[in-house]
Amino acid sequence: VSGTALRAGFNDSAITHHLAMLAIMDADGFDSARREIGEYLVGDVQDNLDGQKLFDGSAMPQSKAAINRKGKTLIDHHHLYDSYVYQLVGGGVEVGSALVYAAINHFGGETGRTGHRFTMKARPVMGIGPRQEAALGNFLIAEIRRAQP
């Protein structure tokens, strides 16, 4: 799964102490926050596809195919929509899609068959912006609160 990683650094020693406690806690404790984060990020991607917006809230560039059929971009058959998953890895969580065309849709670039090549606009439906950062921070704060004696 290609995906998104989250890194956070804190100067506050109390928060650092609690994060260290999370790292050495029973795996079930920290796993719940990572699962919540994974489920949130997959849901965020699906909400973005449903709402035809990018991760930053801006409108998704429409494909010619979607315009011609008067439908939605990247969601006609739900293949890409259903392909986004998360998995717990080490001390984090990976979120992404294993579909080859997920990358070209995310980053944009030249694609198509020989003689029919074109430049596809980037449509990053997955990402970490201010809205996602706030939600992820809330999941971690909730986990720290659960770890309190």
Question: Language-model segments: what does each one mean?
Answer:
Residues 1-149:
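Short, Lys/Arg-rich flexible segments
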